[in-house]
Structure formats: structure tokens, C-alpha cells
């Protein structure tokens, strides 16, 4: 499988190299054609400059590179103006020479002399008109040929430019396609590596030694949790025993001390007030208050014992939920975290207690239905 990918990679690299080579060759040929055209234009202008002083190249061409330079057109306007003036002067001179020629021709005695008395003569005007028509016709013919040639050159240049653009676009599209193939090949290689890694991981997971080690780690973690729960249970049992001793001493003292008896009755009335006014939900029992530690606890029969610590008069500081078993109380961590996340920090103690009791009663009912 890897050899197949290597073969594809070699072919893609080969195609990329060929594409780059042909693209560079095409660009080089295009550049050479442009330079050849510029060289030909420059040579034509040089030849014109040698034959006509109106077209000149300043300075001498000392090297081959300088002979390929494009003519500086900055002085063309001045040359054009001079050329126009010279053409007008040539026209006037031509007319003068033609007039003189006609004058000499027709004033000298001859058997075929034309009777032309002046430039305003009808015969002279007619001949001049014919000459201008012939001249204009010849000029128009040459102009049409020049325009047709220019149009052909323009069309050929456009076709050549379009062909060059098409070649460049083809090379560009080919390069993009090869880059996409290369990216897909890399992605395929990555996916195969991930698949191989996943298969190796599955093999490792099926290894009995690794599984045994993971089970051992899980057992150690469970033992640690059990030890923590046993310590928590021991602390709660010590608290219950201390509370029972306190109640026992309170009863003994209350029999002898009227003040203690009065406080005990007030505490019982306070518990009854909480049971009737602040905890209206049925199904709770064994409400106990601990004013000094700001704690109180109650049972949601027959499964849960709840211990709540108040931060102030309106806020829960801590909530602990324990499950009852035959001998001790065991903290239900999952349920405890759920209730903490939902009600810890609530600003309404009454609604918070109401919701906690509802939640625990639903758990009791769900367990009973199962």
C-alpha cells in the first residue's frame, strides 16, 4: 500500500517538473519573440534614420545590447512639426517648378505647344486637377494597403496573444491540478497513518497485560475512594454520637435546670416552625438545627439524608447528600455534585429547599418503580 503511494508521488513530481520546464520554455520563447520584434523595429528605424535626417537616434550604438534599445519618442513631436513644414515647403517648390516648367514648355516654340497663358488658365487648372486626382488616388490606394496590412498585423498579434494566454492558463491549471493531487496524496497518507495508529491502539487495548494494569489502577482508585468514604462515614458517626451525647446531657440537665428546659422547648418549637412554615413538603423528617455552625439536616425517607450549611440568612454555602444503608451513611457524589451545581449560591432558601426536596423525592419514586 505504501509502495502504491510512493509510485503516485513519483509520477506527480515528474509531471510537476515537466510542467515547470515547458512553462519556462514557453515564457522564454515569448520573451525572445518580443525581443526579436523590438530588434527588427529598431533596425528599421535605424535604416530610416540613415536615409532621412528627420528620424535619428542620438548617440552611437556601441554594443549589441544598445542596438536592441527602443527609440526614445520624446523628440518625435519636434521632428513631426519639422516634417510638416518641409512637406509644405516641398509642395510650394513643386508648384513653382511645375509652373516654371509649364511656362518654359509652352512659351518655347513647338508644334504641340499648349496655349496656356497663366496658372488661372482653364487648361492649366484642368491638368492640375488631373494630377491631384492621380496623386490622391495613388495615396489612397497606398493608405488602404497600409491599413489592411496594419489590420492583418493587429489580428495576428491578437491571435498570438490569445494563444500565449491560453498556453499560460493551461500551464497554470495543470500546476494547480498537480498541487491539488499532491495535497490529496498527503491527506491520504495522513489518513492511512491515523488508521494504522488506531489499529495499533486497538491491538494495545486488547493486550491482556495492559488490560490487567488498567484494572489494577481502577482498583487502586476505588480503594482510595472507599477509604475516603470510610473516613467521612467515621466523622459523621462521631458527629451523630456527639449529638446523641449532647441530647442525653441536655435531657439530664433539663430535668434539673429550668433554663435549659426552656431552651430545649424553644429549640423544639423552632424545629416545628421550620417543619410547618419553611419546609412545607411532605415526606421529610428528623429535622435538626445546629445554630453555632449554621447547619441543619433532615431526611427524605427512606433513602436520603441532607446536610445544608448557610453562608448568611439567604444563601446556601454547602449542600451534602448522603444515602442510607443498613449500617452507615454514604455520600452520593454524583447526586451531590448535581444538586450543588443547581442550587449552591441560590438567594432564595425557601425555593432552594423546595427544589432539593422535590428532586430527592423523584429519585426515591424512580428507585421504587424500578
From Swiss-Prot:
The gene is KRE28. It comes from Zygosaccharomyces rouxii (strain ATCC 2623 / CBS 732 / NBRC 1130 / NCYC 568 / NRRL Y-229). Residues 115-249 form a coiled coil. Its main location: nucleus. Signal peptide: none annotated. Component of the KNL1/SPC105 complex composed of SPC105 and KRE28. Part of the ten-subunit outer kinetochore KMN network that includes the KNL1, MIS12 and NDC80 complexes. Pfam families: Kre28. GO terms for biological process: homologous chromosome orientation in meiotic metaphase I; regulation of meiosis I spindle assembly checkpoint. This is Outer kinetochore KNL1 complex subunit KRE28. Keywords: Centromere, Chromosome, Coiled coil, Kinetochore, Nucleus. Acts as a component of the outer kinetochore KNL1 complex that facilitates microtubule-kinetochore interactions and the spindle assembly checkpoint. Kinetochores, consisting of a centromere-associated inner segment and a microtubule-contacting outer segment, play a crucial role in chromosome segregation by mediating the physical connection between centromeric DNA and spindle microtubules. One of its GO terms (cellular component) is kinetochore. It is found in: Nucleus; Chromosome, Centromere, Kinetochore. Belongs to the KRE28 family.
Amino acid at each position: 500500500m505504501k509502495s502504491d503511494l510512493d509510485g503516485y508521488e513519483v509520477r506527480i513530481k515528474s509531471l510537476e517538473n515537466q510542467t515547470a520546464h515547458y512553462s519556462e520554455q514557453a515564457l522564454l520563447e515569448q520573451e525572445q519573440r518580443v525581443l526579436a520584434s523590438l530588434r527588427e523595429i529598431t533596425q528599421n528605424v535605424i535604416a530610416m534614420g540613415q536615409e532621412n535626417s528627420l528620424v535619428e537616434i542620438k548617440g552611437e550604438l556601441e554594443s549589441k545590447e544598445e542596438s536592441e534599445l527602443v527609440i526614445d519618442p520624446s523628440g518625435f513631436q519636434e521632428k513631426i512639426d519639422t516634417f510638416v513644414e518641409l512637406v509644405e515647403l516641398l509642395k510650394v517648390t513643386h508648384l513653382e517648378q511645375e509652373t516654371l516648367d509649364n511656362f518654359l514648355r509652352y512659351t518655347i516654340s513647338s508644334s504641340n505647344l499648349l496655349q496656356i497663358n497663366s496658372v488661372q488658365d482653364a487648361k492649366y487648372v484642368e491638368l492640375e486637377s488631373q494630377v491631384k486626382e492621380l496623386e490622391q488616388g495613388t495615396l489612397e490606394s497606398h493608405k488602404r494597403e497600409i491599413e489592411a496590412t496594419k489590420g492583418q498585423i493587429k489580428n495576428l498579434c491578437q491571435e498570438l496573444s490569445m494563444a500565449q494566454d491560453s498556453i499560460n492558463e493551461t500551464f497554470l491549471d495543470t500546476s494547480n491540478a498537480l498541487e491539488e493531487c499532491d495535497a490529496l496524496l498527503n491527506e491520504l497518507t495522513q489518513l492511512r497513518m491515523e488508521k494504522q495508529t488506531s489499529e495499533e491502539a486497538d491491538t494495545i487495548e486488547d493486550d491482556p497485560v495492559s488490560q490487567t494494569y488498567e484494572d489494577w489502577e481502577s482498583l487502586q482508585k476505588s480503594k482510595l475512594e472507599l477509604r475516603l468514604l470510610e473516613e467521612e462515614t467515621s466523622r459523621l458517626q462521631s458527629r451523630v454520637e456527639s449529638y446523641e451525647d449532647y441530647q442525653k446531657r441536655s435531657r439530664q440537665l433539663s430535668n434539673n435546670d429550668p433554663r435549659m428546659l426552656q431552651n430545649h422547648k424553644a429549640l423544639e418549637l423552632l424545629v416545628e416552625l421550620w417543619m410547618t412554615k419553611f419546609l412545607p413538603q411532605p415526606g421529610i423528617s428528623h429535622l435538626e438545627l445546629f445554630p453555632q455552625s449554621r447547619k441543619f439536616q433532615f431526611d427524605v425517607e427512606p433513602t436520603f439524608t441532607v446536610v445544608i450549611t448557610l453562608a448568611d440568612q439567604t444563601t446556601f454555602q454547602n449542600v451534602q447528600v448522603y444515602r442510607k444503608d443498613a449500617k452507615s451513611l454514604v455520600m452520593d457524589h454524583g447526586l451531590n455534585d448535581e444538586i450543588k451545581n443547581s442550587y449552591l449560591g441560590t438567594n432564595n432558601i425557601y425555593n432552594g429547599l423546595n427544589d432539593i426536596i422535590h428532586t430527592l423525592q423523584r429519585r426515591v419514586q424512580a428507585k421504587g418503580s424500578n
